[in-house]
């Protein structure tokens, strides 16, 4: 008689499905993402925005050494959440794929093609023994001949295109903000403010020096990293907006109590 595999065995082997059809190692990899830094991506009428709260855990850390947004090609940029070492491997591979496309075909790779190549790599690591899934989610965005594109990849290799999305520990809260505030006709400057507004809801204090932000505009189609000084201006505007909302909510509460 065939001996049954203990339940605990299903979460040790990456290539074995549980009786419920689950790959536990992939789910554990997703948990690494859920514990990661919060990243927000927004597709605007004239470009795209990425913003990440780097979540500096010690005042002794050199903030400039913590990078969460990476330029892949002239027109493509990616934000990461999850295991830092895994991010380095996939970012290097993405850059390699982008350059190989230029050499082979004499043109820049499209955002969708690059995202699919990265997802193919991620998927392969869920199907072969002797390895583990990447504990990493990526937001891959940029401008190509199809205008602005924004893709999210998860540890299983799944690929979804969004108008606006978030990954990391603050995803549930950030998604609530995006679902209520996002407008397809907003411009990049408004998208930058919305991204930081969403991040402000996921943390006690939003510090400009801890924010990594990049944009790609339709006009230039080139990745542009946003300076700390500019981020600071937007953060101040965001907190003014938050204070105004809180004051309005308090006013409404008082009026309800009076009634």
Swiss-Prot record:
It holds the Pfam family Proteasome_A_N. Keywords: Cytoplasm, Proteasome. It is found in: Cytoplasm. GO terms for molecular function: threonine-type endopeptidase activity. GO terms for biological process: proteasomal protein catabolic process; ubiquitin-dependent protein catabolic process. The formation of the proteasomal ATPase PAN-20S proteasome complex, via the docking of the C-termini of PAN into the intersubunit pockets in the alpha-rings, triggers opening of the gate for substrate entry. Interconversion between the open-gate and close-gate conformations leads to a dynamic regulation of the 20S proteasome proteolysis activity. PROSITE patterns: PROTEASOME_ALPHA_1 (PS00388), PROTEASOME_ALPHA_2 (PS51475). The keyword Aminoacyl-tRNA synthetase does not apply. Gene3D superfamilies: Glutamine Phosphoribosylpyrophosphate, subunit 1, domain 1. The keyword Zinc does not apply. One of its GO terms (cellular component) is proteasome core complex, alpha-subunit complex. InterPro entries: Ntn_hydrolases_N, Proteasome_alpha, Proteasome_alpha-type, Proteasome_asu_arc, Proteasome_asu_N, Proteasome_sua/b. Transmembrane segments: none annotated. Component of the proteasome core, a large protease complex with broad specificity involved in protein degradation. The 20S proteasome core is composed of 14 alpha and 14 beta subunits that assemble into four stacked heptameric rings, resulting in a barrel-shaped structure. The two inner rings, each composed of seven catalytic beta subunits, are sandwiched by two outer rings, each composed of seven alpha subunits. The catalytic chamber with the active sites is on the inside of the barrel. Has a gated structure, the ends of the cylinder being occluded by the N-termini of the alpha-subunits. Is capped at one or both ends by the proteasome regulatory ATPase, PAN. Belongs to the peptidase T1A family. This is Proteasome subunit alpha. It comes from Methanococcus maripaludis (strain C6 / ATCC BAA-1332). The lineage of its organism: Archaea, Methanobacteriati, Methanobacteriota, Methanomada group, Methanococci.
